[in-house]
Every structure is written in C-alpha cells, then in structure tokens.
From Swiss-Prot:
Record Pfam families: PCMT
Record-annotated active site: S119
Compositional bias of kind Low complexity: 39-49
GO MF: protein-L-isoaspartate (D-aspartate) O-methyltransferase activity
Family matches, as CDD domains: AdoMet_MTases
Region described as Disordered: spans on this chain: 1-60
Protein name: Protein-L-isoaspartate O-methyltransferase
Biased composition range(s): Pro residues: 1-15
EC supergroup of this enzyme: transferase
Catalysed reaction, written as an equation: [protein]-L-isoaspartate + S-adenosyl-L-methionine = [protein]-L-isoaspartate alpha-methyl ester + S-adenosyl-L-homocysteine
Gene symbol of the encoding locus: pcm
Its EC number(s): 2.1.1.77
Domain of life from the UniProt record: Bacteria
Biological role stated in the UniProt entry: Catalyzes the methyl esterification of L-isoaspartyl residues in peptides and proteins that result from spontaneous decomposition of normal L-aspartyl and L-asparaginyl residues. It plays a role in the repair and/or degradation of damaged proteins.
Length: 271
C-alpha cells in the first residue's frame, strides 16, 4: 500500500470533488475543498476567444497565471509532463462565472451553479496523473463531468474522451464550454447515470470518478480494459482515493492513496 501523499507546502486537509450533497464537513470550506456548494451566481458557458467581460479581460494575462499554476503543481508533486502541459493549455477562467474569473488559477474549488463546483487544480492533476501513469490511454471515461474542465484537460492528450454528467444543467454548461473551445468533437458528452458507465463504448484505458461510493460500482470495473486503471474516492466518513488496475478477466489490483473528502456518488439522472 502506498503512503498517503499530501502536496508539499499544503497542510493535510480533506478534499472533496464530486456531486450531489451540498453540505460541508467540519473544517471544509469552499476555498479548501471540492465539495460542491450553493453558489452566489450561476456559471455561464465560456465566451469565445477575445470576448469582452471580466473573463475575456483575464485572458490577456491568463497564460502567465496558468504558468504559475503549473509551477505550483510541480512543487505539489505532479511530474507527468502531459498533465502539466494540458493544465497549461486549458483556460480554467473560461469554465467559471465571470465574477470568479480572477480566482480561477488559485488551488481552490469554485462554484459553477446547480450547487456544484469545479474541482481544484491539484485534485484534477493528481487523479489524471495517477490514472495515466506510465501508459498512453486512447479511450478514457470521466464520471461527473461538471462544467467540462477535467474533460477538456484530458482531451489535450487523450484521443477519445467520454464524459458523463447526471445533472442536465451542468451537461448543458459543459457542452457550451467544450464547443467554445472547439473540443466538442474530442469529447463525447453524455447526460446519464455515471454509475452505469458506458458499456456500449467500453473498454476504457482509464476511468476517473469524481464522487465517492461505499464501493466502486462493478459496472465500472467491468468496463476497464486489461491493464486499465480506475481512480475514485471510496468510503463514507473515512474516504480514500483508490487506484484500481485490471489485471485479468476477473481480477483487479487495488492501491490506496490519499485520505480525501468527496460528496456521495449518486445513481440516476437529474433533469
């Protein structure tokens, strides 16, 4: 079992990307957690490049801010250059409300509407890097697309990305963002139940799950390709990231990683 990893320079704390609940655990706030909270405003689809407004103005120096974010990720232990380059390429400020664009490159979760958040950059980088370490995945499934940011990062180096979002409003939001960045043909976005996966598209070289179940759904394990990896939070009050690799037709290798705090994985869809 690997020892839990905490990003250098950050005190140990729960982390909680995911979707469903709006409650915050003790000590977790919108600034230090990915727990999705009730937002003050609703996020809007990304404006086209060069558009006005605060998000468009931030674009003038967003390259510098993204570079600083990537340098911070390096100090926090992210070493996969594919992931770092992808994070540097995707304009995170276009995935949040214009009123929050100035905070887009902080290592913080930010509200995107529908009582949900965009996951903090370190969590996105950590999960993608773990799922793709020492391999070149060509088909990846994301469960819990949110505003589309993580799918956009994956699409920078993965040929075929499939992303499922159970909340209709977020599905529409993510679709608008991906279209604005001309990534709609690189990411197949589905409004559906992520716990079921996409059996008609499987197998997947990697699966990234953005909410915690008491156990990893067997349907998702079955949809991993041989040698494929799934990363997800698991547990109720005491949660950990788990990395699962398929080693045979009916065998999987499990490795526990960091202690985390995610909201529950939920079945079904929300219109």
């Amino acid at each position: 079992m690997r020892k839990p990893v905490t990003p250098p320079g950050n005190p140990p704390r729960p982390r909680s990307p995911g979707y469903g609940s709006t409650s915050l655990a003790p000590g977790i706030t919108a600034a230090n957690s990915n727990t999705r909270i009730s937002p003050p405003t609703l996020a809007r689809p990304a404006p086209a490049a060069g558009a006005g407004g605060q998000g468009g103005n931030l674009g003038l120096n967003s390259d510098r801010l993204r570079h600083a974010m990537v340098q911070r990720l390096r100090t926090q232990g992210i070493v996969d250059e594919r992931v770092l380059n992808a994070m540097a390429a995707v304009p995170r400020h276009l995935f949040v409300d214009e009123a929050l664009a100035s905070r887009a490159y902080e290592d913080a979760a930010l509200p995107i509407g529908h009582s949900q958040t965009i996951s903090q950059p370190w969590v996105v980088a950590r999960m993608i890097a773990a799922a793709c370490e020492d391999r070149n995945p060509t088909r990846v499934l994301e469960v819990g697309a949110g505003c589309g940011y993580q799918a956009a990062v994956l699409a920078q180096f993965v040929r075929e990305v499939h992303a499922i979002e159970r909340i209709r409003g977020l599905f529409e939001l993510a679709r608008g963002h991906l279209r604005a960045l001309r990534l709609a043909t690189r990411v197949r976005l589905i409004h559906g139940d992520g716990m079921l996966g996409l059996p008609g598209v499987a197998p997947f070289d990697a699966i990234v799950v953005a909410a915690a179940g008491l156990a990893i759904p067997q349907a998702l394990l079955d949809q991993l390709a041989p040698g494929g990896r799934l990363i997800a939070p698991e547990g109720a009050s005491n949660q950990r990231l788990v990395l699962i690799e398929r080693t045979g037709t009916a065998s999987w290798k499990r490795t526990e990683l960091e202690a985390v705090r995610f909201v529950p994985l939920r079945a079904g869809i929300q219109s």
